[in-house]
Amino acid sequence: MLSLLHGLNEHIDADLVCYMEAEFSESAREMGIPTQVFEGGFNVGLKKTRELIENGDYDIVHCHGSRANLTGALLKKHFDIPFISTVHSDYKLDYLGRPMAAMTYGQLNKLALHRMDYRVCVSDQMRQTLIDRGFEPSELFPIYNGVDFSRPKPDITRREWFCDIGCDFPEDSIVVGIAARFDAVKDVATTVRGFAGAAEGNDRLRLLIAGEGREREMLEALCAELDIRDKVFFAGWVNDMDGYYASVDINAISSLSETFPYAVTEAARAGIPTVASRVGGIPRLIINGETGMLFEPHDHEAMTRCILALANDEVLRKKLGRAVYDKARREFSTESTCRRQLKIYKTVIERYNEPRCGVVICGAYGHGNAGDEALLTAIAGQLRSIDEDMRIVVVSKNARHTRRTHGLSAIRRWQVLRLRRELKRSKLFISGGGSLIQDVTSRRSLWFYLHTISLAKKHGCRVQMYGCGMGPLNYDYDRRRAAETINRCVDAITLRDPLSLELTREIGVTVQEVLVTGDPVLNLRGRSDADAKAFLRSHGIEPNEKYVCLGLRNWPGFAEKSGEIRAALQYLYDKRGLIPLFMPMNYDRDAAITEPITRGMSAPFRVMPKTEDAELEIAIVRQMKLCVAMRLHSLLYAACGEVPSVGLSYDPKVTGCARYLGISCIEFDDVTAQRLIDTAEAALSESGTDELERRFEYIKNAERMNIETARRLLGE
């Protein structure tokens, strides 16, 4: 924190208030940070802090820690400036094992956090934790602790440092180190157990424990019970952490909960590989097998395997140490943290002072359809490319699900008064993506979406129909109403396919800016192949087999066509070795159609479990050899991964998109086994060709006009 404050003072005036004189305040003064200490109890500190803010020309009050949070919460009503707090740890776990403290200090801290205008969360995982507990996503900013890479390495040998602390480990020891306070949430006992198992397989292993706390006696007793007392050294509180990290070979973290601990970045600065529990923001830096090793909390046997793998392979230790150093220097330096904090301050002040900012998105979200959720992921991600802290509010059928799944603020569709308030505060209203302007599934939904467009314009928003599809519009009244509303209210339209453009002209849309771009999902990158394979393997699906992905849906006449599809799948397995893998996009509706297709089929098949993770699903489809789909977004996922595809069109939107993507498409009523086989063979013959790659790249480039249009409408 002091390094961050020192860096901030190179750009802004930042004063530090402490409530007790201690080493922290002394160090701050030595670093040149303007520091005041208000001792004398809570009320004295509260009064002096209020006087300081009243007499100072401050733009923001930034609180760190439970006492500061409570002070800020009580003072907030007296000042017209934003109050923010940095959430370093889970307030529900801060007093784990201390029920009285949790009932008093813990509850007061919780209430104080709710009173803040904004919260800075140390890691995306901590931000997600607060979202799950009801905090407004648009008021939460993620940040990651940085480390100062400019500090020189300590001029001390391991032997000298061991002598200073009274440790007599042999010179050739492989030292595992853990630096943590001894309380339940840090779970140092798992490290002790994990080390004990590893020590049985490598006699050179030693464990150095730096820290103090209520669990010390328990930990010492555990070492004795495991018969490793002669291989463990308790160093107590360590002031020279540079010397500590220069003296260990493997850094250990076994916490049950973390944000983004300094222990992981300090070890990275020293070039030491880390073995850590998969909690909080740790996986942002520690990528399993690439920059360190991860295990699940409490799993001391997995920790044993990780420690042994590193202890028995010096080359691997050096490789992971170099990799984590490079990644930390690139992404987690003090300078990058300082820039991030300054950006948060700028955003907070702008929001506090400007009457309008951000975007409201309205679409078919919260219905449980993976395709629509992928659209929201894509649109939000593109908006974040303009400003990573952009205020985004989503109109959703299931606002709670949208908040938790996407990390975005959301309101229910029937909350009209709340929608009006949000529109008055926003610059841009996005209608889309997807096929919202159609009256096949429901006329009422069409009228709802047209009403929201009209409402947005009435309340001063610029309006964009974003990467959307148009039609079908079967009723004359709906066609007239759609054209009238769009012409009156919409500033720009970006369409996902040429058929939609034809319909806009047909119904009389005269908006000047109408572009054919593409579906926003096309530019989702997807997660890594390693993530996809790990997910498949964890659900009993061998990722190295060859698969044909099936994105089907129930539709009138499906039962009659299931035999044709079954015969084609049997052929693809017999002749091509392709195992059918069913991937339901709307799990509640699509999963049941697997049974009539597979009934009597001798080919093996697999069914993808529900994920609610569009980026993971794209990565999984990328592993496929072929995609056969009725669901539009199954075809789009395949296009993202440049996988050969066959469309089975039950709706003009599928035909239009398939034509735009250059994908072969069969009208659903015309599906026969032989036609499906012939079309699949033709698609497979294109696999890996330059033409396929060029076609998809062209369309992805065109799709980028969706966000460029939004950027211009936002005035960015």
Language-model segment annotations:
Residues 288-289, 293-300, 309-314, 665-671:
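Conserved acidic donor-binding segment of nucleotide-sugar-dependent glycosyltransferases
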Residues 153-169, 527-541:
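A short helix/loop element that forms part of the nucleotide-sugar donor recognition site in Leloir-type
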Residues 1-6, 174, 178-197, 207, ...:
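A conserved mid-protein helix/loop that constitutes part of the nucleotide-sugar donor-binding site
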Residues 350-716:
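Active-site anion-handling motifs in enzyme catalytic cores
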Residues 1-43, 126-129, 214, 392-406:
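N-terminal strand-loop element at the rim of the active site
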Residues 237, 256:
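Aromatic "clamp/platform" in nucleotide-sugar-dependent glycosyltransferases that forms part
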Residues 63-69, 87:
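Short His-centered aromatic/hydrophobic patch
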Residues 17-18, 273-276, 286, 627-629, ...:
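Short hydrophobic beta-strand element within catalytic cores of glycosyltransferases
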